[in-house]
């Protein structure tokens, strides 16, 4: 089912309905979707996956996935999931259900698509180098080509770069998946996915089915910059700019005085 964000967290009748659904054990997966996924609606929504045939060992749990920040931009008003992104989202569900064989088959599919058996991070790094080298080659070739041939030369390299970037995108999706789940072990990922029990949902979260209430936020990556040291550097730069500004104002004022203004 596709539902609004309101119906998965509102109280009143909506809450009563959610409680009854949760108590059945048939709520399988809840997924948040970002903006601009539908032509007629730009607002975010939620996907409800209900399953009366859930295995016994999963009846007491629900998988929450927050995919609001995971998508491909088509244009200013349209987002979508690429085929590989859809496969990755499916892979999270497979691992939650213990279907590791499907996950491993996806890794094999990635390697086949990339025609490379190295670790995905190595493949990504190599492709990034290839893209950069191709850009530099293209720039030099276009500059060296006769004026009448420059457009054709640029188009030739654009096609080659497009093919390389497509492979790089696939490699990045493979890295995105394997950095989180390795060779096929499900784990809760802050900001992305979380398995919660019916007791937690009903008694601690007020029957909310909002994935964001469970998955939390992704940790902020450390960029390796010493904040205090950087602030001192910025302060010093500001003082130098202020001093330079004062000197310029003095020069301008002096010149105006000499002109009798």
Question: Could you say what each language-model-derived stretch is?
Answer:
Residues 259-261:
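Long, low-complexity or tandemly repetitive, helically biased scaffold regions used
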């Amino acid at each position: 089912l596709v539902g609004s964000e309101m119906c998965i967290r509102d109280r009143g009748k909506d809450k009563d309905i959610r409680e009854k659904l949760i108590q059945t054990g048939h709520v399988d997966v809840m997924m948040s979707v970002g903006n601009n996924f539908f032509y007629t609606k730009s607002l975010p929504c939620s996907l409800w996956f209900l399953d009366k045939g859930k295995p016994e060992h999963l009846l007491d749990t629900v998988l929450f996935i927050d995919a609001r920040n995971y998508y491909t931009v088509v244009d200013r008003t349209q987002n979508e999931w690429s085929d590989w992104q859809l496969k990755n989202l499916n892979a999270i569900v497979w691992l939650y259900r213990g279907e590791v064989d499907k996950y491993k088959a996806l890794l094999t599919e990635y390697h086949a698509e990339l025609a490379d058996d190295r670790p995905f991070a190595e493949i990504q790094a190599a492709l990034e180098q290839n893209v950069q080298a191709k850009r530099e080659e293209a720039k030099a070739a276009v500059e060296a080509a006769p004026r009448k041939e420059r457009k054709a030369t640029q188009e030739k390299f654009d096609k080659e770069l497009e093919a390389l970037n497509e492979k790089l995108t696939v490699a990045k999706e493979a890295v995105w998946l394997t950095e989180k789940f390795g060779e096929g072990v499900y784990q809760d990922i802050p900001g992305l996915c979380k398995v919660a029990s019916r007791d937690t949902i009903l008694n601690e979260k007020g029957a909310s089915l909002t994935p964001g209430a469970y998955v939390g936020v992704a940790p902020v990556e450390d960029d390796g910059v010493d904040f205090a040291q950087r602030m001192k550097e910025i302060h010093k730069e500001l003082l130098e700019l202020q001093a330079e500004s004062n000197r310029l104002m003095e020069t301008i004022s002096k010149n105006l005085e000499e002109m009798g203004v």
